[in-house]
Amino acid sequence: MSHEGVIQFEGEHKRRELEARRYGELACELIAWREIMALTGLVGQEPGRYEGAGYGNASARIGPRSAAIGRRSFLITGSQTSGNRRIGLGDFAVVDGYDYRANRVRSHGCAMPSSESMTHAAAYDASPLVRCVLHAHSPVLWRRRRALGFPETDPSVPYGTPEMALEVGRLYRETVLPERQIFAMGGHEDGIVAIGRSAEDAGGVLLRWLARAYGTACGEGDGEVCST
């Protein structure tokens, strides 16, 4: 049974509209890249994938780089919104704070925050330079993750958990993640995460690696052209 998209943290969520004046511009940047991800099959919802569950999400930091760990607030696409063909500000939430040990997330917005909020939070805690996180689902990238040299989380660690958050921190400290800006989720089928200093930066990283993965697929000589 697929657990894709199921929230596994305790939430303190206040349901209220997000101010367009404060969050609208950043939301539009994320919506633009989410559209690109949808067109390339990196985010969405299909009957034949993951038992029909939605997949993929996007976030961006808000507030100063100097914010304390655990309080690096961010705007993130809402839970169960991956299958929506179009989204707006009402499909986002703001994560105001989080605690790995307590497995708790504080947030507000019309939508509940993504089930992967802990993973996004861990990327922001890893470095104040990280200002955007894009979580994609790509069979071609995931299958070629080792050939491409991606850092990879422990396959025994489930997604959306405090343990996954700790894994993300470990990858940032101990691997080439700061330079490559991308990692694979070893125990989360097709899960790929790109990080960057902006949505454009993270999106560019994701697309460059995707192009490289398709290029290696075409060069394998298996009779298929750019097979996923």
Q: Where is each model-derived feature located?
A:
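Glycine-rich flexible loops
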Residues: 1-228
